[in-house]
């Protein structure tokens, strides 16, 4: 199973500016009475990535997410941008195999706001136009039925080789639904509370070598 770390945010520049101006005003008061001067308005933001490191070159199937996802709210469309999430797949060849199948299934996809609101966002996952869902497997490769995997086709060609084979492809991730408090659904994302949502999107991959 592989997962992407995600953050999503809605930010209002006006609020940030007001906080900065207030801080400057307080400093002015504490440092004495002087001639009033115009002050520059600045803002600063920090992005943080969760990080781990792992190496596995012996398992029969290894899937690695390449990069993280960051959804940003766009006021003009009252929605969030979509993201392309790349992944790398490595398999061990089985010289006795006559067919190979690779499927994916969504495991987790909920982001929760990092405050007391309880607001949530659900992330949809799409693979080459097919939804990856929790209720069933999405076929990515099925050599017995002529599904050779597109960008993952090196796996379809190398599943019965005597060495390891790798290939890369990607999912499309979008925000498909949300709540204001964990229960009340929203139809207009502009009504969501301000803040940052965080969580993991996990997709399980299953590989089958048939002899």
Swiss-Prot record:
Protein species of origin: Shigella boydii serotype 4 (strain Sb227)
Q: What is its main location?
A: other
Q: How is the quaternary structure described?
A: Self-associates. Forms filaments. Interacts with EcpD.
Localization terms from the record: Fimbrium
The gene for this chain is: ecpA
Entry-linked InterPro entries: EcpA (IPR016514), Fimbrillin_EcpA_sf (IPR038478)
Q: Which UniProt keywords apply?
A: Fimbrium, Signal
Similarity comment: family membership: Belongs to the EcpA/MatB fimbrillin family.
Report the leader peptide range.
1-38
Lineage in the entry? Bacteria, Pseudomonadati, Pseudomonadota, Gammaproteobacteria, Enterobacterales
List, alphabetically, the GO terms of the cellular component aspect.
pilus
Q: What is this protein called?
A: Common pilus major fimbrillin subunit EcpA
Q: What induces it?
A: Positively regulated by EcpR.
Describe the function of this protein. Answer: Part of the ecpRABCDE operon, which encodes the E.coli common pilus (ECP). ECP plays a dual role in early-stage biofilm development and host cell recognition. Major subunit of the fimbria.
Q: Which domain of life is it from?
A: Bacteria
């Amino acid at each position: 199973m592989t997962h992407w770390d995600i953050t999503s945010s809605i930010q209002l520049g006006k609020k940030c500016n007001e906080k900065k101006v207030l801080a400057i005003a307080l400093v002015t008061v504490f440092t004495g009475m002087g001639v009033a001067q115009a002050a520059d308005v600045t803002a600063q933001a920090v992005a943080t990535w969760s990080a781990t490191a792992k190496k596995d070159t012996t398992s029969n199937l290894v899937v690695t997410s390449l990069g993280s996802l960051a959804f940003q709210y766009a006021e003009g469309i009252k929605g969030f941008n979509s993201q392309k999430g790349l992944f790398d797949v490595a398999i061990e060849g089985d010289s006795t195999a006559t067919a190979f199948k690779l499927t994916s299934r969504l495991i987790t996809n909920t982001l929760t706001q990092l405050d007391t609101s309880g607001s949530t966002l659900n992330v949809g996952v799409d693979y080459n136009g097919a939804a990856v869902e929790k209720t069933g497997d999405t076929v990515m490769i099925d050599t017995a039925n002529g599904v050779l995997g597109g960008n993952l086709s090196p796996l379809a060609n190398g599943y019965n080789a005597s060495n390891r084979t790798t290939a890369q492809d990607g999912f499309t991730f979008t925000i498909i639904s949300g709540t204001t408090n964990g229960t009340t659904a929203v139809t207009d994302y502009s009504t969501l509370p301000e803040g940052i949502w965080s969580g993991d999107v996990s997709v399980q991959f299953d590989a089958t070598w048939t002899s």
